[in-house]
């Protein structure tokens, strides 16, 4: 069956607008995806008709809001095939989820002389928390290098592990190159050395199904806003045996069992002890609607359509004069490129004049930029609502820029 892209586009009101007098071609979903009516309406309805503070409220609105919030936890658990909803922590996004692991599990389990392995393609959110932890603890941060095609040099990975390796923290899909890393092989190698595994799934969950049990990772984290949901909400999955042992890293309301000025404080059980303060309940409701939305379309169908569009885009972009494409032939979601020696910001500004939205800069991946020897790249990302026509507009726009700038 043909993917109903026009029907999908009709669900996203922002796609009907114009930019600089031209129809918007939104090719920046890897930074943040647009929101369908179903998500907007669900969050709006909650604030209009169902809002109340969750937890401990005896009145109807509070009880209903709490139930709705916990139902989304169960729904997200099914979405990634966790064993239990109580393995999922609501966080503000991928960045907070990784910081939670670093400051809770990491503080308890990393010692001087230990090491953590990351890769050269990581987003800053999966670099900086580990740098900070290693500096605090006197541990070593080891880095998996890249091949020129944007895949990891996996032949070097085994030598990076030793009996002091405590964690492999790896992106599922690169936010710049679109590289999908071979997680089963990497996780199996980590297991041989007794290391835990954290997966940054921010660029994966919208493109295909994720099964955390099949992966056998210890931590998996993703953001709602890249999954067509609201900003300020994400999911951290932690294997139950680890989560129950982890101490809280933020204190306040909701995460306690008892508080005494003379006898100290005891914690709520996990996952609630990691959710201090008033939660983003509206965002949680919106995340549930986003999961419903992509599930109703079918992640397999979304993935097939996006891969067809990706192949077309790579073929067409390769014909643009003086373009450099970065990353492997087989990729998910994103195409990073530069045009001649022109700065990415200049190219992106011209494209914006043509109504085309792309991301420019270092994409929170400065070590990757340094590896390629460039200060910045343009990045076009392809989502389920993008079309062949929008790809054609990008190609025409870049060809026009090349003619204008040389």
From Swiss-Prot:
The modification N6-(pyridoxal phosphate)lysine is found at residue 226. One of its GO terms (cellular component) is cytoplasm. It is found in: Cytoplasm. Pfam families: Aminotran_5. Its main location: cytoplasm. The keyword Coiled coil does not apply. Pathway: Cofactor biosynthesis; iron-sulfur cluster biosynthesis. Coiled coil: none annotated. Keywords: Cytoplasm, Lyase, Pyridoxal phosphate, Transferase. InterPro entries: Aminotrans_V_dom (IPR000192), Aminotrans_V_PyrdxlP_BS (IPR020578), Cys_dSase_SufS (IPR010970), PyrdxlP-dep_Trfase (IPR015424), PyrdxlP-dep_Trfase_major (IPR015421), PyrdxlP-dep_Trfase_small (IPR015422). Belongs to the class-V pyridoxal-phosphate-dependent aminotransferase family. Csd subfamily. This is Cysteine desulfurase. It comes from Salmonella schwarzengrund (strain CVM19633).
């Amino acid at each position: 069956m043909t993917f109903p892209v026009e029907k999908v586009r009709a669900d996203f009101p922002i796609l009907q607008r114009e930019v600089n007098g031209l129809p918007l071609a939104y090719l920046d979903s890897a930074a943040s995806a647009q929101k369908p009516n179903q998500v907007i309406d669900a969050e709006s309805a909650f604030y209009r008709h169902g809002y109340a503070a969750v937890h401990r409220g005896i009145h109807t609105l509070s009880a209903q809001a709490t139930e709705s919030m916990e139902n989304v936890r169960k729904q997200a658990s099914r979405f990634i095939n966790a064993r239990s909803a109580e393995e999922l922590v609501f966080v503000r996004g991928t960045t907070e989820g990784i910081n939670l692991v670093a400051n809770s599990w990491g503080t308890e389990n990393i010692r001087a002389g230990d090491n953590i392995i990351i890769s050269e393609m990581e987003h800053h959110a999966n670099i900086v928390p580990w740098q900070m932890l290693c500096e605090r603890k006197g541990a070593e941060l080891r880095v998996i290098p890249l091949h020129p095609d944007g895949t990891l040099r996996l032949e070097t990975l085994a030598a990076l592990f030793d009996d002091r390796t405590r964690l492999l923290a790896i992106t599922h899909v690169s936010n710049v190159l679109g590289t999908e890393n071979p997680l089963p092989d990497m996780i199996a190698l980590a297991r041989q050395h007794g290391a835990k595994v954290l997966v940054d799934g921010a660029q994966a969950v919208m493109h295909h199904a994720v099964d955390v049990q099949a992966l056998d990772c210890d931590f998996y984290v993703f953001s709602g806003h890249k999954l067509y949901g609201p900003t300020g909400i994400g999911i951290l999955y932690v294997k139950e045996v680890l989560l129950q042992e982890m101490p809280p890293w933020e204190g306040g309301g909701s995460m306690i069992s008892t508080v005494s000025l003379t006898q100290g404080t005891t914690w709520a059980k996990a996952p609630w002890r990691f959710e201090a303060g008033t939660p983003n309940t509206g965002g949680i409701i919106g995340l549930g609607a986003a999961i419903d939305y992509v599930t109703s379309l079918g992640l397999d169908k979304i993935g097939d359509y996006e891969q067809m569009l990706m192949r077309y885009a790579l073929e067409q972009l390769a014909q643009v004069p003086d373009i450099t494409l970065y990353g492997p032939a087989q990729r998910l979601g994103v195409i990073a490129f530069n045009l001649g020696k022109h700065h990415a910001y200049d190219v992106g500004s011209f494209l914006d004049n043509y109504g085309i939205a792309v991301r420019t800069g270092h994409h929170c991946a400065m070590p990757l930029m340094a590896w390629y020897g460039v200060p910045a790249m343009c990045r076009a990302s392809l989502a389920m609502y993008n079309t062949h026509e929008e790809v054609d507009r990008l190609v025409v726009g870049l060809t026009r820029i090349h003619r204008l700038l040389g």
